[in-house]
Amino acid sequence: MKYPPVHYHDYLGLNPLLNAQHPKSTEYGKPAHDELLFIIVHQTYELWFKQILFELDSVLSTFQKPTVAESEMGIASARLERIVSILKLIIGQVDVLETMTPLDFLDFRDMLYPASGFQSYQWRLIETKLGLRIGDRLAYNQSPFYKSLSESQQGEMLNIMNQPSLHDSVEKWLERTPFLQGENFNFWDSYKEAVNKMFQDDITTVKNNPRLPDEEKAKTVAGLEQTLKSFDALFDEEAFNKLRAEGQFRLSYKAMHAALLIQLHRDQPILQTPFRIIRALLDIDETMTTWRYRHALMAMRMLGQKIGTGGSSGHKYLADATAKHKIFGDFFNLTTFFIPRSQVPPLPKAIADRMSFHY
């Protein structure tokens, strides 16, 4: 045998794992049956957070390279998709926790002060490494989020906050996307023409519709013209950067263009993996938002208007965080600039050939 035998129990470290639950209600001589469930669900969250961080660190190391090989992109995409699957799984764990009734929870809740899920170092690491900036977070008890962590964790978190996040690294990767402009082709010139033609055709159709009253025509045309105006930022870098400075965009002008190109031409072989990566990042943001929302609903169900054990406003804080804590919002907002696939300008043959595989 090449390696010495290993026992299942020892390999999984089950002795320390299964003896890591220490209910406070038992310690205080007032055993509450559901406290063990409460502990195990939260310990399971932390185990899954550890796996998410393991996958996330791998993806970060890939995208922080000056160039990313196609094979590495496939691996990164698969690991991001694994993170999505884990996040969906932990959302399902809320169902298990909700088998505990509010009265069951009150049997031991007062014994937990001031412990709070807000103190989860691993969850804060996940958010920060993905790219949730301190300015995009809700203040917690009028203090920065990291102040709820232990002193050693605060130092580590401040160090992580000063390093490039996945959002930062993906932005730089997008900026390196080729194909946006060729020797005799500028994608954005052709896309602008297609957008203008689509809206002008719609405006002409409305104006020539004999069944619409003049007032309705004017209102519809004004709406179409306003929507067309929203595309200005896409074609005017100065206008885009002004909106970006106001916080309406986070990605750079070049990165936004690349992300839109990938979405519009995702069926091209060379863009299929980049599209999977963008979709996985969207899914991560969405599932994290869903998990926060389920957490907020559970807090309302368990606590009503009571404050949280960590001193927060409970349900209200969680609901507000659900609405505010977004990371890849620009990818969601890209759909603003979509036009029907039938009207997307075709790529020149030379560029389409470069995007394709040949045998």
Swiss-Prot record:
InterPro entries: Trp/Indoleamine_2_3_dOase-like, Trp_2_3_dOase. Heme-dependent dioxygenase that catalyzes the oxidative cleavage of the L-tryptophan (L-Trp) pyrrole ring and converts L-tryptophan to N-formyl-L-kynurenine. Catalyzes the oxidative cleavage of the indole moiety. GO terms for biological process: L-tryptophan catabolic process to acetyl-CoA; L-tryptophan catabolic process to kynurenine. Belongs to the tryptophan 2,3-dioxygenase family. Keywords: Dioxygenase, Heme, Iron, Metal-binding, Oxidoreductase, Tryptophan catabolism. Substrate binds at F38, I39, I40, V41, H42, R109, T309. The gene is kynA. It holds the Pfam family Trp_dioxygenase. Homotetramer. This is Tryptophan 2,3-dioxygenase. Its cofactor is heme. Heme binds at H295. GO terms for molecular function: heme binding; metal ion binding; tryptophan 2,3-dioxygenase activity. It comes from Bdellovibrio bacteriovorus (strain ATCC 15356 / DSM 50701 / NCIMB 9529 / HD100). It catalyses: L-tryptophan + O2 = N-formyl-L-kynurenine. Binds 1 heme group per subunit. Pathway: Amino-acid degradation; L-tryptophan degradation via kynurenine pathway; L-kynurenine from L-tryptophan: step 1/2. Its EC number is 1.13.11.11. It comes from the Bacteria.
